[in-house]
């Protein structure tokens, strides 16, 4: 226990005093501090669960409490948020509410509760507060104690700021936000036209570059992005018009190729079949449990006809021919069928849909 405490103290001190630092620099300073096994500390650091340390876009590490001290991030309050005392965190507040993942920042400076909640994950708490899932932003929300926003005098459309002070996180009602003079331009410089950046990391990098950034309230990050022709999806930042779907598809195919030692074409075929399996799973979830699989299949075929997607089914038939390779057939099962019966049922539905479109060898596989 004492050794773990010493490592925590060492990481906090090293990054607070000398960050941002590369992992090699951290390891060297840990050794100088008397930590016997720097590699073990670095492994714990990479998990991002024990300490409020995070990486910049260049992979250097920073101590967030030091980097964000005195900075304020704003969010324009939505109607549901005003009613239910919560603030959507993505993208406006992500850079600072990351701190809420750590116990000491799970409450505001005044002692009131503040925690990140997700629809479908924090169901019991949301039900207790009478908050419907659809009111929660997909990226999550910072849930405040009832009456917090009313006490602040904040209503729908108002700007609310979250600032890190020496006492912890505090909420501020923002009257008029100042003009952004550098952050938007710096974020535009940080994004790669071919690869999105992790959004909070880009903002933290901008904070390292400009010690004055966000020390006074400016417009919400969402609005700053719009002003500079940038776009975001979930936690990712990219130039306007970036094709996130194609990027995710390529990444997933590369992962499958690496995981199973596949050539690129086989990885594309496998991932396309996995995505079709996901579609079948969603279709089954939305279907009456008493409906027979063949009825579900008929519904899927009817939907394909109504939406003009016969060409897609034909294309997937071509890809399904890859199942003539026993290895790909085995990998499809491994990637889609879990411990529940839903995965197997969806796979059966997928097989039945593809059967008329694929060669006999693939049907046998």
Task: Walk through the language-model features, giving the residues of each.
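Short, basic interhelical loop/turn and adjoining N-cap
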Residues: 31-40, 209-216, 355-357
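Extended alpha-helical scaffolding segments
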Residues: 314-365
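Positively charged, polyanion-binding regions of nucleic-acid-associated proteins
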Residues: 1-24, 183-211
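Short, basic/aromatic beta-hairpin or loop at an interaction surface
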Residues: 123-143
């Amino acid at each position: 226990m004492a050794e773990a405490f010493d490592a925590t103290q060492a990481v906090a001190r090293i990054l607070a005093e000398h960050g941002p630092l590369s992992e090699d620099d951290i390891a060297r300073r840990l050794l100088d501090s008397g930590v016997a096994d720097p590699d073990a500390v670095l492994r714990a650091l990479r998990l991002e669960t024990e300490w409020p340390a995070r990486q910049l876009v260049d992979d250097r590490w920073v101590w967030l409490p030091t980097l964000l001290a005195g900075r304020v991030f704003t969010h324009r309050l939505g109607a549901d948020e005003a009613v239910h005392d919560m603030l959507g965190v993505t993208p406006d507040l992500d850079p600072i509410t990351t701190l809420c993942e750590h116990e000491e920042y799970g409450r505001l400076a005044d002692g009131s509760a503040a925690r990140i909640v997700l629809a479908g994950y924090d169901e019991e708490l949301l039900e207790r507060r009478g908050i419907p899932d659809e009111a929660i932003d997909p990226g999550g929300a910072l849930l405040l104690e009832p009456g917090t926003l009313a006490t602040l005098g904040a209503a729908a459309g108002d700007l609310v700021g979250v600032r890190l002070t020496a006492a912890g996180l505090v909420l501020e009602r923002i009257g008029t936000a100042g003009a952004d003079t550098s952050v938007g331009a710096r974020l535009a410089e940080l994004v790669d036209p071919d690869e999105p950046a992790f959004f909070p990391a880009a903002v933290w990098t901008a904070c390292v570059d400009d010690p004055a950034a966000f020390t006074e309230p400016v417009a919400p990050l969402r609005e700053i992005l719009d002003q500079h022709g940038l776009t975001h999806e979930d936690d990712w930042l990219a130039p306007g018009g970036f094709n996130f779907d194609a990027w995710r598809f390529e990444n997933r195919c590369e992962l499958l190729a690496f995981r199973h030692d596949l050539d690129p074409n086989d990885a594309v075929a496998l991932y396309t079949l996995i995505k079709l399996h996901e579609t079948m799973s969603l279709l089954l979830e939305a279907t009456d449990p008493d409906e027979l699989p063949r009825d579900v299949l008929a519904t899927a075929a009817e939907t394909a006809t109504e939406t003009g997607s016969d060409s897609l089914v034909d294309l997937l038939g071509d890809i399904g021919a890859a199942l003539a390779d026993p290895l790909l057939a085995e990998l499809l099962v491994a990637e889609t069928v879990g411990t529940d019966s839903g995965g197997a049922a969806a796979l059966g539905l997928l097989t039945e849909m593809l059967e008329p479109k694929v060669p006999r060898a693939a049907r046998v596989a």
